[in-house]
């Protein structure tokens, strides 16, 4: 049962543990908010379009950070935009995840030596998955999001909130 968390019994019932069911639900229901700052946002739109269709992975775009648990940062983060990004991140519900998309979001990119650029969004918010490229392709973003889904499913049960805790 460790290799396959869902087991089909002879009577047609699916037997699993609560942890495996919670992991599957969290993995397949990541609602994301786009934080498109530059040209990488165009590739993010391609990934959300009909050809790659992020909805089939359970990833639905939301406009409000209070409804999201995933932020995709795409593009050059400037010093002026950094406090706004942190404020939006703080408004997101727990557990929250961040995907850094593109060279500019990962480490400053082409504008690394500019006085007005933050050299990586991980200096402002904790990043879970980095997607390299300038700009990264839609396939690379989808692969990065699949890696995030794997990471969400493999979280330990100790880091999840307790549903039925004794007082």
From Swiss-Prot:
InterPro entries in the cross-refs: NADH_UbQ_OxRdtase-like_20kDa, NADH_UQ_OxRdtase_20Kd_su
Q: PROSITE patterns from the entry?
A: COMPLEX1_20K
Any one GO molecular function term: NADH:ubiquinone reductase (non-electrogenic) activity
What topology in the membrane does the UniProt record assign?
Answer: Peripheral membrane protein
Q: Which GO terms describe its biological process?
A: aerobic respiration; electron transport coupled proton transport
What residues does [4Fe-4S] cluster bind to?
39-40, 104, 134
EC category: translocase
Q: How is the cofactor bound?
A: Binds 1 [4Fe-4S] cluster.
Q: Where in the cell is it found?
A: Cell inner membrane
Substrates-to-products reaction catalysed: a quinone + NADH + 5 H(+)(in) = a quinol + NAD(+) + 4 H(+)(out)
Keywords assigned by UniProt, alphabetized: 4Fe-4S, Cell inner membrane, Cell membrane, Iron, Iron-sulfur, Membrane, Metal-binding, NAD, Quinone, Translocase, Transport, Ubiquinone
Q: Does the keyword rRNA processing apply?
A: no
User: What EC number(s) has UniProt assigned to this enzyme?
Assistant: 7.1.1.-
Q: What does this protein need as cofactor?
A: [4Fe-4S] cluster
Any GO CC annotation of this UniProt entry: respiratory chain complex I
* HAMAP family according to UniProt: NDH1_NuoB (MF_01356)
Briefly, what is this protein's role? NDH-1 shuttles electrons from NADH, via FMN and iron-sulfur (Fe-S) centers, to quinones in the respiratory chain. Couples the redox reaction to proton translocation (for every two electrons transferred, four hydrogen ions are translocated across the cytoplasmic membrane), and thus conserves the redox energy in a proton gradient.
Per the record, the similarity remark reads: Belongs to the complex I 20 kDa subunit family.
- How is the quaternary structure described? NDH-1 is composed of 14 different subunits. Subunits NuoB, C, D, E, F, and G constitute the peripheral sector of the complex.
Query: What protein name does the entry list?
Result: NADH-quinone oxidoreductase subunit B 2
Native source organism of the sequence: Burkholderia mallei (strain ATCC 23344)
Organism lineage string: Bacteria, Pseudomonadati, Pseudomonadota, Betaproteobacteria, Burkholderiales
